[in-house]
Design a protein with these regions (language model features):
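A nucleotide- and high-energy phosphate-metabolite-utilizing enzyme signature
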Residues: 1-254
Length: 254
């Protein structure tokens, strides 16, 4: 939703913030949000509308369902003792305000830009993102000889993690990476500004587009998202080339 890359069957990762000085605001907005989630997820004779995931809120599922904007901004910008993890900043690269008054949306974009512009330790950031990729791989093992268009090495998750690393590590020097234009657009921009060797960025963008199409088709037809390796040889090689260009030999450890 945030990255404008919603697929068939995708859940919605939502974070709810409010800007209201009323002392009961948190309680009131939490009740409203619970009703909203119920409306969006209720099972009907025609199925359900969306699955909702609120785990990206500050402190995950152990945190408050709704957060004041000031608390959210402090959390994301690492002010105070309760601060965001790197994987939450990865999510911020794809975040977008989808509902709310214009002023609050602008304040959110300011916070998002500040997070992306933060200068970071490149090797440390790389290690954290590679470690998170390993955890995702452990949680979604690929069985059999097929190529899973999302989770196999060289597939969509590898491409997405590489893009997120580029945005977080280079956003302080390349403002063109701040715009939330989706993975394909960001790969093209990273290629244009010299962050990727020719033609790695363009090839990975084409691969991501192909893998997305395969995923859409499989979900519409209620089919598995694994395809024969030979069907996606070029796309897989492009995804692996991107990962190697960004993370180096760490790809072998995923």
């Amino acid at each position: 939703l945030g990255g404008k890359e919603l697929g068939y069957g995708s859940d919605l990762d939502l974070v709810f913030v409010y800007d209201d000085p009323d002392e009961r605001a948190g309680e009131i907005y939490a009740a409203l949000v619970r009703k909203l989630i119920n409306w969006l997820t209720v099972k009907t004779g025609e199925g359900d509308l969306y699955e909702i995931d609120t785990a990206l809120r500050p402190n995950g599922n152990s945190g408050l369902l709704v957060t004041s904007f000031e608390s959210y901004a402090a959390y994301q910008q690492n002010r105070g003792s309760n601060t965001a993890w790197t994987w939450e900043h990865q999510a911020m690269t794809r975040a977008r305000c989808v509902l709310g008054e214009h002023g609050l949306a602008q304040r959110f974009e300011t916070v998002r830009a500040a997070v992306i512009r933060t200068e970071r330790d490149g090797p440390g950031l790389r290690d954290e993102i590679v470690s998170m990729r390993k955890r995702v791989a452990s949680a979604h093992p690929v069985r059999g000889d097929g190529f899973d268009v999302k989770h196999s090495p060289g597939a969509m998750v590898d491409i997405e993690f590489a893009v997120q690393f580029l945005v977080l590590s280079q956003g302080c020097r390349h403002p063109e990476l701040l715009d939330n234009v989706g993975n394909i657009g960001l790969l093209e921009r990273a290629q244009t500004c010299g962050l990727l060797p020719t033609p790695v960025g363009h090839a990975a963008a084409d691969a991501y587009r192909q893998l997305r199409q395969l995923q859409h088709r499989a979900r519409l037809n209620e089919e598995p998202t694994q395809v024969p390796q030979e069907q996606v040889t070029q796309a897989r090689q492009a995804g692996l080339a991107l990962w190697n260009a960004v993370f180096g030999a760490a790809v072998q450890k995923v």
